[in-house]
Amino acid sequence: MQLDDDLEFAKKIFNPNRAFAKQARIKNMCEYKDLVHEANEDYEHFWGELAKQKLTWFKPFDKVLNSDNAPFFKWFENGKINVSYNCIDRHLKDKKNKVAIIFEGEMGDYNVITYRKLHSEVNKTANLLKNEFNVKKGDRVIIYMPMIVESVYMMLACARIGAIHSIVFAGFSPEALRDRINDAQAKLVITADGTFRKGKPYMLKPALDKALENNACPSVEKALIVIRNAKEIDYVRGRDFVYNEMVNYQSDKCEPEMMDSEDPLFLLYTSGSTGKPKGVQHSNAGYLLWAQMTMEWVFDIRDNDNFWCTADIGWITGHTYVVYGPLACGATTLILEGTMSYPDYGRWWRMIEEYRVDKFYTSPTAIRMLHAKGENEPLKYNLESLKVLGTVGEPINPTAWKWFYEKIGNSKCSIVDTWWQTETGGHIISPLPGATPIRASCATLPLPGIHAEVLNEDGTKTKPGEQGFLCITKPWPSMVRNIWGDEKRYIDSYFSQIKLNGEYVYLSGDGAIVDENGYITIIGRTDDIVNVSGHRIGTAEVESAISKHEMVVECAVVGIPDTIKGEGLFAFVVLCDGAKCNLGESLELLKEMNHILSVEIGKIAKLDNVMYVPGLPKTRSGKIMRRLLKSIAKKEPITQDLSTLEDVNVVKEIMSIVQMEE
């Protein structure tokens, strides 16, 4: 019955709030179509004019787009710019006393940072990096930090002096941190002693110590530690230095480095299907332009708005919509330390009420969890300040969408269901809150200037209602520029599978369906990446970790639907010598494998289900038939062609286990 209700609700069309639409930047579909037409008529002129109007340049660019070495595209060639200057300095004349950042700590502490204060702190931090740690333009700096204001200072300080920052999510294990440090060949690592989570200290420095032990990261010269929770920690003499003790001795004046448009701004590591994380490389100018434009178009950001994106800065959403996008627009951005559930599940709604949040951006996983923990909890708070709601990271189901729309938005806020990726830098497909009629769980239309299409493997367009591969058929300014140190992997990952008019196009790895009106609905991953609570986890990485258990011979991991997390991890495990285990042993083995995953990858990687099988279904070339295993895990009929299997009896044995468990 619930499924029928969801399907019926998903067909409904919700028009933008009329009062909101009247004052929106893009007020109706005619204006949207005019922008799309303008971009289609003269693609380079469209992007060039936006770059001239929206960004502050030290030296103008002389060419909008250089495609000579495609797919290594260059945007705004020979222009000189600085991201930190665009996010801070240019606002000082009119907004120096405006609040740039509102910070609320887990333990109730509170901090307000004006643009003038932000300018001072970023400059002092930049001088500290230059003068005391010899960080220069092009050096890589790893930031392993929690959600505190100093994390933003570090990002902007790196941007100011031309260093390339790479943020590693603070929930990642020492091993995952070590891999990223070594791949980036980082010179400096910045962390905090710890943070607070669920009302208790959560330590980070010990993870850094473990990552660096035994000279495991030879490129690292020094470590900079921010004192946050003041718990006693160990220091390595000559390597570890305390930020809080040094930064105030630095000058608050630091001239921004003149950066080329195409110089790397940051690396952000994301899961790859081979198991080795990919260092996604983003540029200065193109990335910042799209961060600002999507804030203006998708969130209709206004000068007096308080904008809150709940993402961690360790993910691309935190980069673009906690830091760079809001600050490029001169807006006020909120930063929250800790979890949604401490001291109770009303924390987020209290924050929206207290800080008069106008635009609120979060994940479907968070929405589902808050819905499950207190369907009517939001009714205790005044959420009338909200004007736009947004979702990110994964498709949102109709039930969660409906609750978000009705209970959080009071049936008056547009929901911008955004589709994009680490590699795209910013939104690609999204409703516009003042213009686009919306449907539950539908990303709707590509943004102006973006050529997103759903294609078959042969490059032809799918028919309405047919599932295909979501591709982007023209370059755009904020696109990934390379995989750090691995050009071949960049081409193989994104530009090697589907051609349109004889040229390879960007393959997103997501499946999608387009309807007769051009609206696009995202289905989910088509490759070996599982989206758990908005976090992309490579199945190869999970399999590699599980296989380290002494009892495991081999395994295969697939994603299955999860009502809270979006997707969960289901493992098919072959044990040593055909060993079998009873229920108690099975649960203990699951616990041990999850411990390994926590150590190797982080707590976000956790097996939800395990099936112990005698073997895995493989083709004669040795490839595991994952789609077949996914069908079994989801308890769907097997429709795959089994003729290529090396041993069809393996499938029969697995199916007999399924029947026994039922």
Curated annotation (Swiss-Prot):
Keywords: Acetylation, ATP-binding, Ligase, Magnesium, Metal-binding, Nucleotide-binding
Keyword Glycoprotein set for record: no
Post-translational modification: Acetylated. Deacetylation by the SIR2-homolog deacetylase activates the enzyme.
Reaction catalysis annotation: acetate + ATP + CoA = acetyl-CoA + AMP + diphosphate
Enzyme Commission designation: 6.2.1.1
Binding of Mg(2+), residues: H549, V552
HAMAP family in UniProt: Ac_CoA_synth
Pfam families in alphabetical order: ACAS_N, AMP-binding, AMP-binding_C
Record-stated family: Belongs to the ATP-dependent AMP-binding enzyme family.
Cofactor: Mg(2+)
Entry's Gene Ontology BP terms: acetyl-CoA biosynthetic process from acetate
Modified residues annotated as N6-acetyllysine in this record: K623
Lineage start: Bacteria, Pseudomonadati, Campylobacterota, Epsilonproteobacteria, Campylobacterales
Binding site for ATP: G393, E394, P395, D417, T418, W419, W420, Q421, T422, D510, R525, R536
Record's GO cellular component terms: cytosol
Record GO terms (molecular function): acetate-CoA ligase activity; AMP binding; ATP binding; metal ion binding
Name of the protein in question: Acetyl-coenzyme A synthetase
UniProt: CoA binding residues: R197, K198, G199, K200, T317, S533
Enzyme class: ligase
Function comment: Catalyzes the conversion of acetate into acetyl-CoA (AcCoA), an essential intermediate at the junction of anabolic and catabolic pathways. AcsA undergoes a two-step reaction. In the first half reaction, AcsA combines acetate with ATP to form acetyl-adenylate (AcAMP) intermediate. In the second half reaction, it can then transfer the acetyl group from AcAMP to the sulfhydryl group of CoA, forming the product AcCoA.
Stretches of the chain forming a coiled coil according to its record: none
Organism: Helicobacter pylori (strain HPAG1)
